[in-house]
């Protein structure tokens, strides 16, 4: 499908990641360039930022995500990469890293381009990543924000275009669990909304693309991008729940242990927990653990908490996650058994056997040489004695 202003969520993500890397700061002042106005339509959404205007990165993020200013997307792109083209390359690279296989960016703001497209699933992926950043959550969850006066403008007041958060643009759609994220409308993409909501520890994202207004029975207009998003989120909270699918302190396998007089095996357990949002009626017994031990047998000593393998949890072919398996107790080494094993290994070593064989051969040769030498000495001694006796006659 064609992208619209949901593109700006990816733009905001890359800006936030640049801040995390220390390449930018929220308070850093940016001077608006003339090139930031490139490729913008005259009737597109704007914050009326002018070339030469000086404004902070944080205020630009509000301009980007509340009034959906197209020029703010280009200004921030230049702040991160120096030029818009390099930033677009970074957008596509990040999309691939996040697993967005059906997405290609051709600009920073979402205005129509034949080479600019995505899927609802991909939008969910990069929106989920964006919402991990405090600054983005703060901005998209704000109903109204005042950008302070700049060198070229009086203060600007902007209202969130997301009717799930604010009645300013459209009445009757506020949803008390909503926390964002971004509206978007172009003639080609239709009316779109990426929304997110939180209920307790459960967090859901809904994506509506290409919605068209409908007329209610009373003649009023139903903006489906908002009403259907709320319906989806409420359905999600009714039918899904945050579930812990692996408990710590439950041994799941044993590893054999040698060189110890205290124990001949040690139990292993998963460390940490895996939590997923799962259907409320899902049979957790159907989740399959796959145990992978580094070794079936290890030598003592073993330390409590020592990583001995991994456990992967899978349901219907989907991998939920992997946990380390650690030893539940320590197992001390027997020094007697250890020394005996060293001696056994010494004599079992093929190199040692060759050396011992060579030593044995040398010893046999030396012994034979000694025997021959002694035999010759006796012979010479006997011959000498016989000669002396004959000389007296």
Each PLM stretch: what is its role?
Residues 100-104, 114-117, 121-382, 392:
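Domain-terminus/edge residues, biased toward the C-terminal soluble/receptor-binding domains
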């Amino acid at each position: 499908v064609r992208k619209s202003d949901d593109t700006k969520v990816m733009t905001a993500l890359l800006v936030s990641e640049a801040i995390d890397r220390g390449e930018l700061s929220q308070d850093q002042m940016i001077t608006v360039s003339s090139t930031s106005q490139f490729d913008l339509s005259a009737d597109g959404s704007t914050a009326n930022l002018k070339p030469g205007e000086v404004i902070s990165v944080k205020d630009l993020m509000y301009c980007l995500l509340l009034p959906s200013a197209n020029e703010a997307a280009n200004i921030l792109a230049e702040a991160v990469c120096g030029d818009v083209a390099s930033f677009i390359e970074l957008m596509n690279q990040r999309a691939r890293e996040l697993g967005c296989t059906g997405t290609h960016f051709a600009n920073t703001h979402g205005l129509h381009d034949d080479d600019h497209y995505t899927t609802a699933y991909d939008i969910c992926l990069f929106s989920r990543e964006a919402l991990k950043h405090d600054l983005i959550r703060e901005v998209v969850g704000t109903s109204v924000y005042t950008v302070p006066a700049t060198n070229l403008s009086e203060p600007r007041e902007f209202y969130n275009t997301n009717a799930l958060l604010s009645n300013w643009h459209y009445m009757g759609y506020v949803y008390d669990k909503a926390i964002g994220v971004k509206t978007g409308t172009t003639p080609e993409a239709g009316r779109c909304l990426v929304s997110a909501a939180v209920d307790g520890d459960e967090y859901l994202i809904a994506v509506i693309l290409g919605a068209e207004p409908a007329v209610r029975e009373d003649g009023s207009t139903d903006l489906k991008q908002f009403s259907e998003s709320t319906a989806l989120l409420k359905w999600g909270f009714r039918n899904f729940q945050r579930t812990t699918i692996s408990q710590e302190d439950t041994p799941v396998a044993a590893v054999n242990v040698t060189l110890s007089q205290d124990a001949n095996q040690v139990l292993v357990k998963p460390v940490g927990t895996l939590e997923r949002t799962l259907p409320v009626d899902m049979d957790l017994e159907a989740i399959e653990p796959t145990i992978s031990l580094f070794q079936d047998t290890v030598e003592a000593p073993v330390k409590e908490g020592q990583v001995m393998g991994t456990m992967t949890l899978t349901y219907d072919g989907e991998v939920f996650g992997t946990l380390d398996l650690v030893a539940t107790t320590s197992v001390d080494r027997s020094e007697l058994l250890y020394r005996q094993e060293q001696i056994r290994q010494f004599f079992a070593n093929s190199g040692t056997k060759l050396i011992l064989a060579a030593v044995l051969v040398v010893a046999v040769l030396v012994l034979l040489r000694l025997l021959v030498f002694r035999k010759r000495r006796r012979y010479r001694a006997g011959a000498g004695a016989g000669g002396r006796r004959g000389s007296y006659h």
